[in-house]
Amino acid sequence: VEETKNFLKILMKYYENFLKDYLDVDLLSEFKSVREWKNFNRNNSHMKEYYGEGQWLNKLRCYLHSKPFVKWVEEETEIDGLVIDSFGTGEGVSLMQTNDMLDSHIDFNWNNRIRMHRAVNLLIYLGSCRGGEFEIWDDKREKTLFEASPIHNSAVIFTHSETQAHGVRKITSGRRYSIRQFYYKSEATCENPHQSLYWYNPETKMPTNS
């Protein structure tokens, strides 16, 4: 199932049955055994965060970083030249339980480590809960433009916006995990681009650009 919403400033797509080959089941089991959760409390937002590794989480990250998957994200968003941050700055796993919520906010737009602009966000949801609707607001944060109740093994892809905030409503019961993956793009240009340059060898007649 795929649902697309284009609000001029944000491209938003929602998918169900996102992960295959029982990877969702393996990840859910792995997350339930994690003990190193850290509390996240900021501006009326509260949940738990995990920035570590795991057998199945590492497998998922390899998949999300792979050439075929990045190409798929480019096709879905119609944004070429996307790259990943191998250090995963700001990425991780969130755990939201009863009374947890994420207040409406604008994401960070610049990754200083790789010197690139944040372009696309991918969220993968595991587990079941009541409440916890994902929502996107208009520029004035007065009207909800999009609202979805992510089910187990669903995903959301949306492009970065400097004006349209998003957030997660309060969880009323249950437990849900979300995995964050970001994709970046450079707006830099090169004044004199070229391929590999070699010293000219008169004996082999090697061209300078081969």
Q: Would you name each region that the model predicts?
A:
Residues 4, 8, 12, 53, ...:
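A structural signal for well-ordered alpha-helical scaffolds and beta->alpha junctions
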